[in-house]
Design a protein with these regions (language model features):
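Low-complexity, Ser/Thr/Pro/Gly-enriched N-terminal "stalk/linker" regions
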Residues: 1-79, 103-124
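Asp-box/WD-like beta-propeller blade repeats and closely related beta-sheet repeat scaffolds
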Residues: 126-136
Length: 149
């Protein structure tokens, strides 16, 4: 049996369960996640995910960023990348100028954290640049590099 791809815009889920879930994700979940990634929700532990990417971008622009300014998990860049991906799917299904602006700003920041050779990983850029590609088994570098493809 041959399968055929269906373009995202060819599918409409305006009604029913899927439509309700898409609306919930677009209007509630993605903005909430964006605020979590930006440490903008009081009373919730800071993720520092986007701040770490900002620090990496600043370091690459020559700013004196200290290794201990990085906070969080080694793999957090993927949380931001996956948020961008989810938001892109939501935007493919319908316009949302506010979400689009947040995505554009996040992509711009992400791009500013990329080394000239294409390397992107805020943990190693900020915390321990001398350890890049030394522990691909445990440090999520290979995973993060594939997330960006």
């Amino acid at each position: 049996m041959k399968s055929e791809r269906i373009p995202v815009k060819s599918f409409s889920a305006d009604n029913g369960f899927i439509g309700k879930m898409q609306k919930l994700v677009r209007e509630e979940v993605l903005p909430y996640q964006y605020n979590i990634l930006n440490d903008a929700i009081p009373g919730v532990e800071k993720s520092h995910a986007i701040e770490n990417i900002r620090l990496a971008a600043e370091k690459l622009r020559g700013k004196d960023v200290k290794p201990d300014e990085f906070y969080g998990m080694v793999f957090q860049d993927s949380d931001v990348a996956k948020w961008i991906e989810a938001a892109a799917y939501a935007l493919a299904a319908g316009e949302d100028p506010e979400l689009e602006k947040a995505v554009d700003e996040t992509i711009q920041l992400y791009g500013a954290s990329q080394h000239e050779d294409g390397y992107v990983d805020s943990y190693f850029t900020v915390k321990c640049p001398d350890k890049m590609w030394t522990n691909i088994c445990d440090a999520h570098e290979l995973y993060l590099s594939l997330i960006h493809i």
